[in-house]
């Protein structure tokens, strides 16, 4: 698996160039590289990647509005107040310094944001599934699209959950809003409900 680590390291420069691209489509070559990463992640089991600390992290994503982010098999994204919910257990894949992709473990889908700022679950790891993870002064993280921002102000689109748990369009978000502030929380196997605990012990 050292090959995978080396491969991820080789794409740092390309990924770091995302913010400067705005709405311009990424090159076919870069999308192809993301596809290769996706393929290698799908072939690998949890134990295969266990030693790659910092590349693959299993977490819940808690929003300051009181909800954990969930990715459902039908591609919808929503928030839940349930701790260790089935669709709220996520894998954070570190692609480069400060750049991550987030995948729902049970749904097998990647968190994506389209040009309208809408969140969705994607079967493929594409450029819309790469986010800039930034540690803020209040100890929370923000997750900004690396592709989409307001053309007039340059303000990025952020992942956000409203006060009712529904996803807010990234085009309607600002960095200082509490609905854009998240805490990645550790996953503890013993806290996962028994009904679906085995799903995560072997993934």
From Swiss-Prot:
Entry protein name: Fibroblast growth factor 16
GO molecular function, one term: fibroblast growth factor receptor binding
SMART domains associated with the record: FGF
Stored Pfam families: FGF
One of the GO BP terms on file: cell proliferation in midbrain
Species per Swiss-Prot/TrEMBL record: Danio rerio (Zebrafish)
Function: Plays a crucial role in pectoral fin bud outgrowth.
Family to which the UniProt record says this protein belongs: Belongs to the heparin-binding growth factors family.
UniProt KW Ribosomal protein keyword: no
GO CC annotation terms, alphabetical: cytoplasm; extracellular space
PROSITE patterns listed in its UniProt record: HBGF_FGF
Subcellular location: Secreted
Recorded name of the encoding gene: fgf16
Keyword Chloroplast: no
Keywords: Growth factor, Secreted
Disruption phenotype: Fishes shown a severe reduction in the size of the pectoral fins.
Stored InterPro entries: Fibroblast_GF_fam (IPR002209), IL1/FGF (IPR008996)
């Amino acid at each position: 698996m050292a090959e995978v680590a080396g491969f991820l390291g080789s794409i740092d420069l390309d990924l770091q160039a995302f913010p400067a691209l705005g709405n311009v489509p990424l090159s076919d070559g870069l999308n192809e590289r993301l596809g290769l990463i996706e393929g290698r992640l799908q072939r690998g089991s949890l134990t295969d990647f266990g030693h790659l600390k910092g590349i693959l992290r299993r977490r819940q994503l808690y929003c300051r509005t009181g909800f954990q982010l969930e990715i459902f098999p039908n591609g919808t994204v929503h928030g839940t107040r349930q701790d260790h919910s089935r669709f709220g257990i996520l894998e954070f894949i570190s692609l480069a310094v400060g750049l991550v992709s987030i995948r729902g473990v049970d749904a097998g889908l990647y968190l994506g944001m389209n040009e309208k700022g809408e969140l969705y679950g994607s079967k493929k790891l594409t450029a819309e599934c790469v986010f800039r993870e930034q540690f803020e002064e209040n100890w929370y993280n923000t997750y900004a699209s690396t592709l989409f921002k307001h053309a007039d102000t340059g303000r990025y689109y952020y992942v956000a959950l409203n006060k009712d748990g529904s996803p807010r369009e990234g085009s309607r978000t600002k960095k200082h809003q509490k609905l854009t502030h998240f805490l990645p929380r550790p996953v503890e196997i013993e806290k996962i409900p028994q009904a679906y605990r085995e799903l995560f012990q072997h993934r």
